[in-house]
Amino acid sequence: MAQQGKILKEQKYDRQLRLWGDHGQEALESAHVCLINATATGTEILKNLVLPGIGSFTIIDGNQVSGEDVGNNFFLQKCSIGKNRAQAAMEFLQELNSDVSGSFVEESPENLLDNDPSFFCRFTIVVATQLLESTLLRLADVLWNSQIPLLICRTYGLVGYMRIIIKEHPVIESHPDNALEDLRLDKPFPELREHFQSYDLDHMEKKDHSHTPWIVIIAKYLAQWYSETNGRIPKSYKEKEDFRELIRQGILKNENGAPEDEENFEEAIKNVNTALNTTQIPSSIEDIFNDDRCINITKQTPSFWILARALKEFVAKEGQGNLPVRGTIPDMIADSNKYIKLQNVYREKAKKDAAAVGNHVAKLLQSCGQAPESISEKELKLLCSNSAFLRVVRCRSLAEEYGLHTVNKDEIISSMDNPDNEIVLYLMLRAVDRFHKQHGRYPGVSNYQVEEDIGKLKSCLTGFLQEYGLSVMVKDDYVHEFCRYGAAEPHTVAAFLGGAAAQEVIKIITKQFVIFNNTYIYSGMSQTSATFQL
């Protein structure tokens, strides 16, 4: 029965399991997400978390469902009017996936912060939507000190805004686009060199010759190239073209002297550029090795930094300046026997390297007084196979962003070289928050107020820019546009932002793929978006 349930789950979540694997899905299913305010944006985010099977969610909202809510929120209906908004949204969202557990709290976030701020620290991540600036600052401070990730989301007219607040977010499985294969052709390890030497391309039957893996072909002709160039690897365009020609000359000829159709040699020629990449440690990994968290290991050091330190020790000793072998090779034209033999050479070396890193992990855990079982074999293997792609994201706190002396002026001013850069929308959002603080409402919420609010909003914008010492000019068109928005939350923009926000939440929970750092702005006017470090 349990096996049948597992098969059904694999079928249900088939596509996403291919993205983040069983361990990513397990992390998702054990997560508890808190949503503050069941707005259109908030329910769209939860929809995109409930469908892939988030473990549980809690909605905090003290408001009752209004006609306006029903008009712009797909997850609220006429029959919901007058009910608590958190409860109504929870009931509809739970219908999407029976595997997910939902709950609600009929209270405002302000009251919870006043009476029980630690309430927010029980969640895996908190997502806050459409909150006032003063409430956000209080919430962000509580979560920052408790090291709970916070994602702020906001839809304002045709503008979408997200801000991630997380002290430190290490990523082992960053899944980089277009990652190069780890073939070590420029620095073959002894077992690989021995394997290459077992091939003699000059004395092979035609069938064997045309089914030799292209990795072997490049390695054999690289040895020939070295003998003619004093061991210098082809680097320039001309050198690589000459090397391709050298391989091309190795294609067998028929009785008429015409080249045979050997696809494996064509594959080798096509892969020259990527196969001859230099084996080296990326600068981002060097930065991790030189980080204080990697150098100073204590009993409180998280597993990621123990693993990073063990990796550093391996590079200095067994790796002889290199990271562990990844242990994978791409598909290629070759007979099964030759391919499997080559694959096993890389796999065995990867296992050997992982075992060496594991020995360093064991010593480090013992030296700092942590339990030997605190780092699993699975974590160790994941680290070794992704050692070239490790990432650490550190976001600034909201207090730093809003501080007069810690605001990132350079990022804002340099971005405003283009007066229509998306950063102008951030400045306008800060201005409307200032407007709300002064007038107790957002500009243009009533049609008759739009014209009179233009001057007031412009005054708020000027005051904000002067207070923060931002010598930039904002076009009047943006002031007019934000007054016309009237703080509306169009469902089309909320739906787009909901998808983007859920993606970042999943990245944080699974610790896979790389989150943005730290602000994302979407413009529905120009259909563009940008990220900023604010």
UniProtKB/Swiss-Prot annotation:
Tissue occurrence: Expressed throughout the brain. In hippocampus, strongly expressed in granule cells and in the pyramidal cell layer. Strongly expressed in the piriform cortex. In the cerebellum, expressed only in Purkinje cells.
Q: Read off the PANTHER family from this record.
A: NEDD8-ACTIVATING ENZYME E1 REGULATORY SUBUNIT, UBIQUITIN-ACTIVATING ENZYME E1
Q: According to its record, what are the GO cellular component terms?
A: early endosome; glutamatergic synapse; plasma membrane; protein-containing complex
- List-wise, which residues carry N-acetylalanine? A2
Keyword Cell division found: no
Q: Where is this region: Interaction with UBA3?
A: 331-344
Query: Which InterPro entries does the entry link to?
Result: APP-BP1, ThiF/MoeB/HesA, ThiF_NAD_FAD-bd, Ubiquitin-activating_enz
Q: Name one GO molecular function term.
A: NEDD8 activating enzyme activity
The answer to keyword Ubl conjugation applying to this record is yes
What job does this protein perform?
A: Regulatory subunit of the dimeric UBA3-NAE1 E1 enzyme. E1 activates NEDD8 by first adenylating its C-terminal glycine residue with ATP, thereafter linking this residue to the side chain of the catalytic cysteine, yielding a NEDD8-UBA3 thioester and free AMP. E1 finally transfers NEDD8 to the catalytic cysteine of UBE2M. Necessary for cell cycle progression through the S-M checkpoint. Overexpression of NAE1 causes apoptosis through deregulation of NEDD8 conjugation.
The protein's assembly and partners: Heterodimer of UBA3 and NAE1. The complex binds NEDD8 and UBE2M. Binds APP and TP53BP2.
- Gene3D superfamilies registered for this protein in UniProt: NAD(P)-binding Rossmann-like Domain
The protein's PTM annotation reads: Ubiquitinated by TRIP12, leading to its degradation by the proteasome.
Could you say which protein family the record assigns here? Belongs to the ubiquitin-activating E1 family. ULA1 subfamily.
- Native organism: Rattus norvegicus
This chain's protein is named NEDD8-activating enzyme E1 regulatory subunit
Q: Give the lineage.
A: Eukaryota, Metazoa, Chordata, Craniata, Vertebrata
Q: Which residues carry this modification: N6-acetyllysine?
A: K6, K341
Q: How is its activity regulated?
A: Binding of TP53BP2 to the regulatory subunit NAE1 decreases neddylation activity.
Site positions (Interaction with UBA3): H211
Highest taxon, organism lineage: Eukaryota
Entry keywords, A to Z: Acetylation, Apoptosis, Cell cycle, Cell membrane, Membrane, Ubl conjugation, Ubl conjugation pathway
State its location(s): Cell membrane
Q: In which pathway does it act?
A: Protein modification; protein neddylation
- Name where it mostly resides: membrane
Against Pfam families, the record matches this protein to: ThiF (PF00899)
